[in-house]
Curated annotation (Swiss-Prot):
HAMAP family: TatA_E. Keywords: Cell inner membrane, Cell membrane, Membrane, Protein transport, Translocation, Transmembrane, Transmembrane helix, Transport. It comes from Nitrosococcus oceani (strain ATCC 19707 / BCRC 17464 / JCM 30415 / NCIMB 11848 / C-107). One of its GO terms (cellular component) is TAT protein transport complex. The chain crosses the membrane at residues 2-22. InterPro entries: TatA/B/E, TatA/E. It holds the Pfam family TatA_B_E. The keyword Ion transport does not apply. This is Sec-independent protein translocase protein TatA. The Tat system comprises two distinct complexes: a TatABC complex, containing multiple copies of TatA, TatB and TatC subunits, and a separate TatA complex, containing only TatA subunits. Substrates initially bind to the TatABC complex, which probably triggers association of the separate TatA complex to form the active translocon. The lineage of its organism: Bacteria, Pseudomonadati, Pseudomonadota, Gammaproteobacteria, Chromatiales. It comes from the Bacteria. It is found in: Cell inner membrane. It is a single-pass membrane protein. The gene is tatA.
Length: 90
């Protein structure tokens, strides 16, 4: 038994017919084109994963930086409230 209920002999006959129809040069060029397309697809996936990792690292860095200085942020918020409160009384 072969693949999906197709015997090995049936697969060989189909392959011989394909070779006769397209020829080896055409099949070789199709294989090369298909290989190039797969390689390009893998490269684009790798680039996308790299970009996602860089974005995640940037976000983590920003969050860590914000977490390091909460007292400075609170002081800046307090200063802003004082300044904006003084502007209202003028």
């Amino acid at each position: 038994m072969g693949v999906g209920g197709i015997s090995i002999w049936q697969l060989l006959i189909v392959l011989v017919i394909i070779l006769l129809l397209f020829g080896t040069k055409k099949l070789r060029s199709i294989g090369t084109d298909l290989g190039s397309a797969i390689k390009g697809f893998r490269n684009s996936l790798r680039d996308e994963e790299r970009r996602d990792a860089e974005e995640a690292a940037t976000i983590e860095h920003k969050q860590a930086h914000k977490a390091e200085n909460p007292s400075q942020r609170q002081q800046a918020d307090a200063d802003f409230k004082i300044k904006s409160g003084n502007d209202e009384h003028k």
